[in-house]
Amino acid sequence: MNPSSEGTDGLKQALSTARNNNASLHLLMLYPALPKELQVHQKAFEAFLSERIEASLKNVQEALGGEVVEPTREVMMSDSSPAVVITRYVLRHGYDLLVKEAEDTGGEGGFKALDMSLLRKFPSALYLARPISHSREKIRVAVAVDPITESEDAYDLNIRLLQNARSIADSCSGVLDIVSCWEYPYEEYLRHTPWLKISDEELADAVVNIWSEHRAALDALIADAGIAGENRVHHLRGEARELLGKFVRNEKVDIMVMGTVARTGITGFVIGNTAENVFEKLDCSLLALKPAGYVSPIKAYE
């Protein structure tokens, strides 16, 4: 929780997630170190922040209704980079998921520096919450995957993306939108190069073959994930960096599930490249996963 934020969307979605998964929940509010001349008031300031947590928690629990998980609470001073403090805290305590309210971008898409730092370096599942206007039964959930993988880790990550997204959809509208982008990157080059004589028919056949291979791999991946329920597949032609943000806006997606890591073998999902470009255009909540075995550059103890 951010002491300077009045929003409770992250808290509401964290409580809802914990309830839906019968999980425990710990609330952590970080605040920056006070100036030297104000440090005498640190205890009083922490008491004030604790009161804010209790008030926000009560309001959200009442809004959710029914049985709600009773979380543990903690107020802690951040004496260094918030991304480092958060990551170390999660590593030391072994939490599976971090739910954080996305920093306010003033109505623009994308994520601010702290959230991007967590997307790059945080090792566990990360959920960046934004306001959701739909009622729970109408919440739109989408997942982005690339079935053409070059490693077992990348394949396993795709399976986890599908299964996690399906679980979220089951607790919302029941419908999961599965998005995958394909393209034939040499098409324009082959069409216009004077050095190769390729007929339009040959080129069209090559494009169809690429589409067919990609779609077959996508269908096989979805089958391997073993996800039941209503799954709507969107097999989009073009670059993921251009199409995913448009898809989210046009389809009014509330929650996007994606993979992000330095290198996984997942074409187009390289943080600092395609994935980062996609993140810059997202205006919805985001669940970001990394492959098993990913090691963060931030260590639990240093």
What are these regions (language model features)?
Residues T87-E137, K246-K299:
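Gly/Ser-rich helix-loop-strand patches that form or flank binding pockets
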Residues Y186-H214, L218, G226-I227:
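Flexible internal linker/loop segments at domain or repeat junctions
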Residues A14, I86, A165, L244, ...:
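Aromatic/hydrophobic pocket-lining residues that form π-stacking "cages" and hydrophobic walls in ligand
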Residues M1-A44, A142-D200, A223, K281:
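Small/aliphatic-rich secondary-structure junction motif
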Residues A44, E62-L98, I222-M256, T264, ...:
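Structural beta-alpha unit
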Residues H26-L28, T72-M76, Y127, D177-V179, ...:
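General small-molecule cofactor/ligand-binding pocket signal
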Residues A44-A55, E150, D200-E213:
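A short acidic, glycine-rich active-site loop
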Residues G10, I53-S56, L157, L161, ...:
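Hydrophobic alpha-helical membrane-association signature
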